[in-house]
């Protein structure tokens, strides 16, 4: 009887594995009505979280982000886009406008979430967490945060570090 109880407790412990703090948030995908739990969808993957904007000098990074996503998603990599109007008012459109722009201009297929605030002092809980862990809050559009398969925030990258950066690519490859 005792071994049976131990096995049951072990199975229950395995099923209640905690969600990593960096993914323990829920957000609504663009134009969706129901939020998704990031942990349920992306735990165990290498995640690149990016704050985006459609009218920014860095907006062409969408192309590189999509390319990176397409090349590496089969190996457990995902890009998560979070549109924000925080910097320069460069994401003024509705969610429908954002989705149409991303799909028609850049063919974006990586997950894009609700328009949100990412700026220090106003950031949504995910970006507040990422800034607290890395010591770096977004200072402009297209800041990037890399999270490993265990949910540890590995590094923050500024807007200047593009998706085709050898440094970023090497770090992602090392985590896959």
Protein language model regions, located:
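Thiol-/selenol-based redox modules, centered on thioredoxin-like
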Residues: 125-176
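Structural microenvironment flanking redox-active thiols in thiol-disulfide oxidoreductases
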Residues: 58-123
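Cleaved targeting-peptide boundary
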Residues: 18-25
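Positively charged n-region of N-terminal signal peptides that target proteins for export
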Residues: 1-4
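Hydrophobic h-region of N-terminal signal peptides that target proteins for export
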Residues: 8-17
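A short beta-strand-turn-helix
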Residues: 25-46, 67-72
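Loop/turn elements at helix/coil->beta-strand transitions in domains of secreted/extracellular proteins
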Residues: 43-47, 73-78, 106-111, 141, ...
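Amphipathic alpha-helical repeat scaffolds
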Residues: 51-55
């Amino acid at each position: 009887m005792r071994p049976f109880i131990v096995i049951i407790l072990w199975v229950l412990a395995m099923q209640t594995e905690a969600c990593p703090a960096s993914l323990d948030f829920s957000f609504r995908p663009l134009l969706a009505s129901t939020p998704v739990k990031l942990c349920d969808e992306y735990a165990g993957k290498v995640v690149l979280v990016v704050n985006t904007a459609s009218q920014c000098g860095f907006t062409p990074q969408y192309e590189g982000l999509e390319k990176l996503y397409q090349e590496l998603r089969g190996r457990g990599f995902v890009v998560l886009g979070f549109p924000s109007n925080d910097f320069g008012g460069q994401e003024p459109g509705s969610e429908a406008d954002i989705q149409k722009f991303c799909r028609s201009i850049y063919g974006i297929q990586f997950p894009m979430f609700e328009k949100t605030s990412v700026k220090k002092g106003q950031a949504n809980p995910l970006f507040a967490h990422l800034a607290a862990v890395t010591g770096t809050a977004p200072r402009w559009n297209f800041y990037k945060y890399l999270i490993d398969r265990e949910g540890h925030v590995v590094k923050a990258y500024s807007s200047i570090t593009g998706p085709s950066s050898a440094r970023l690519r090497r770090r992602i490859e090392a985590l896959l």
